[in-house]
């Protein structure tokens, strides 16, 4: 059993208590149309999306705590959607938990299913040791990783949540040409 499954019952109340939910919603500030939330956990963003929301998480224990009609238990490295399905693809505090080799196929999939905008709120390099401890990150994301996965990065920043997480906005490279 993995840590996410064990923590599922306490995860959402703890995140609300520490103010993470408010920080997390910053990824939606420029979203439009349909939104895919990769690594959605208990789908805290679902009620803040005016259009169609689809949440994907591999952990059924997290999804059973979520509310919303469009929740999918699936591996983010093999998203079960056709190319260019979603207007906006978001992810918060998920990618930084993975090693770069595990992240790469997920980043590629996020670009594949997106038509317009990708927004992530994740620990981004460089990150001080103290801030890295706040994120529980295995390794902060490097902007070059995003570009290598087919993203055209439009903006990096601001840092939020004690400066430990950075909002990154990108487009799939096919669209940015």
Task: Give the label of every model feature segment.
Residues 104-116:
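A short glycine-rich, Lys/Arg-flanked "PGG" loop and its adjoining helix->strand segment in the class I
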Residues 1-31, 44, 127-129:
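Conserved class I S-adenosyl-L-methionine
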Residues 169-177:
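C-terminal lobe and adjacent flexible extensions of AdoMet/dcAdoMet transferase-like proteins
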Residues 119-167:
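C-terminal alpha-helical "lid/dimerization" subdomain adjacent to the S-adenosyl-L-methionine
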Residues 93-94:
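Short catalytic micro-motifs in class I SAM-dependent methyltransferases
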Residues 99-100:
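Helix-capping/helix-break motifs at membrane-protein junctions
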Residues 90:
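A conserved beta-strand element that flanks and buttresses the S-adenosyl-L-methionine
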Residues 36, 41-78:
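Class I SAM-dependent methyltransferase SAM/SAH-binding core
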């Amino acid at each position: 059993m993995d840590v996410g499954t064990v923590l599922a019952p306490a995860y959402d109340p703890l995140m609300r208590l520490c103010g993470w939910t408010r920080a997390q919603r910053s990824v939606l500030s420029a979203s439009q149309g349909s939104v895919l939330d990769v690594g959605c956990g208990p789908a805290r963003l679902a009620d803040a999306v005016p259009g169609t929301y689809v949440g994907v998480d591999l952990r059924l224990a997290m999804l059973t705590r979520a509310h919303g009609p469009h929740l999918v238990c699936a591996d983010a490295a093999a998203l079960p959607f056709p190319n260019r399905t979603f207007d906006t693809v978001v992810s918060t505090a998920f990618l930084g938990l993975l090693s770069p080799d595990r992240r790469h196929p997920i980043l590629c999939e996020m670009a594949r299913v997106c038509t317009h905008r990708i927004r992530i709120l994740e620990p981004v390099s460089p990150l001080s040791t103290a801030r890295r401890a706040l994120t529980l990150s295995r390794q902060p994301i490097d902007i070059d990783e995003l570009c290598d996965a087919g993203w055209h990065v439009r903006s990096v920043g601001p840092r939020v949540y004690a400066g430990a997480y950075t909002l990154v906005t990108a487009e799939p490279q096919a669209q940015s040409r």
